[in-house]
């Protein structure tokens, strides 16, 4: 009797899995079969490939389709959007309100400070939180942060590393120095003598630098953030660890007055309380240092690989420096560095901080036919996740000829257009700190390359591999470079 019961249970389980894995096909949609538990994300679950690479494969295998059905972890049906017009409708057009929520899972009771992040917040709350931050990043406000950036650049200039160095580590030291000063009015001690004296470590580096480092734990965190809150609760995940939450609250209490972002927030009309200030400070700090550090490291790497692009950038630096008496950390001079900014945008195209955006349907709406000329619309139900594959879009040869080549000229004569470039997102939920991020990164790139050439530390070094273990893009084995002094031509 027992063998028969077990056989029936096994057969029922297999039939259920088959039925579940054919969800999209039953609705007449072209889609791969979804395997039990892992859906189409097996290599991601095993830490073999990043989630961006999985989505890129689905994107590439389905040319001619406006969208593709697929299965996330735990075989959850989802939709990957390919069509540029559909992307526009979802991000900035008539369907924005239907899927305005970002599908990122954080326990708001355990992660109180992270819950103030407008990227994470959902419902109507994200609008209120974003409205608090937007006034901090107007062009005039961003210019007011330039003294903080200039001080960090001076420290960076005084100690350009000799010999082999890891680019992301150097970039993280710099961006932490900037954001600590710009947000709190504090010195993070990440550059200067503290960089050279091993027995005087910076608390900022000790606590924040490891936060986004690849590890098995970071893979579990990425799964819980992007796929299932149940896993997050099971492993006790916090986007902002508890000791950091306590420390951020202390920093808010100890902030200095003057021209810093936190002081401007405290003086805002909404009259923010200490907990709201701590939440916004957490957002500004975590999103202000990591993504900019990643961009600076990858920009240096791409310029080391592409000598012609680096040569052209040096020519621009020399020409602009000649017009400004050698001072490039100046709002007018930085604005004239168009090729340098194009190089940063091109590095961000090749290495986006987030490899995909995920939107959760907040009300039922209808997608057009999957293929042009077909006559079968798809009703998207409440709770369905729509994936906007940033990495795949950025590497689509139909949108960018020779997409794997580093060509800053793509962005030289025109800004990124439409939804072809999603390095900062798009629409009402676009990154509000884009201007400050580009300013601090461009200033650092200028400082490092005004008197130096950058090159690979090892001539036979292969292309940098992206770690499959992290939520934000990171290198698997580091980005190892070296500097060589050059003579300015002015």
From Swiss-Prot:
It is a peripheral membrane protein. Transmembrane segments: none annotated. It is found in: Endoplasmic reticulum membrane; Microsome membrane. Its EC number is 1.14.-.-. CDD domains: CYP6-like (cd11056). It comes from the Eukaryota. Keywords: Endoplasmic reticulum, Heme, Iron, Membrane, Metal-binding, Microsome, Monooxygenase, Oxidoreductase. GO terms for cellular component: endoplasmic reticulum membrane. Its main location: endoplasmic reticulum. Its cofactor is heme. One of its GO terms (molecular function) is monooxygenase activity. It is an enzyme of class 1 (oxidoreductase). Pfam families: p450 (PF00067). SUPFAM superfamilies: Cytochrome P450. PROSITE patterns: CYTOCHROME_P450. Heme binds at residue 431. Belongs to the cytochrome P450 family. May be involved in the metabolism of insect hormones and in the breakdown of synthetic insecticides. PANTHER family: CYTOCHROME P450 (PTHR24292), CYTOCHROME P450 308A1-RELATED (PTHR24292:SF104). This is Probable cytochrome P450 308a1. The gene is Cyp308a1.
